[in-house]
Amino acid sequence: RYCPRNPEACYNYCLRTGRPGGYCGGRSRITCFCFR
């Protein structure tokens, strides 16, 4: 729901889940991926 328009929100969402961050990726960058 954050991507592809708001990669910063995706990043912050991942931070809140305890991950070190995240990015928009996949087809057309529509998926928010969290770093492990």
Swiss-Prot record:
Keywords linked to the UniProt accession: Antibiotic, Antimicrobial, Defensin, Disulfide bond, Secreted
Residue pairs linked by disulfide bridges in the UniProt entry? C3-C24, C10-C32, C14-C34
Compartment list: Secreted
Coiled coil stretches, renumbered: none
One GO BP annotation of this record: defense response to bacterium
Which InterPro entries has this protein been placed in? Answer: Defensin_invertebrate/fungal, Scorpion_toxin-like_sf
Provide the primary localization. Answer: secreted
Job description of the protein: Antibacterial peptide mostly active against Gram-positive bacteria.
Kindly provide the name given to this protein in its UniProt entry.
Answer: Tddefensin
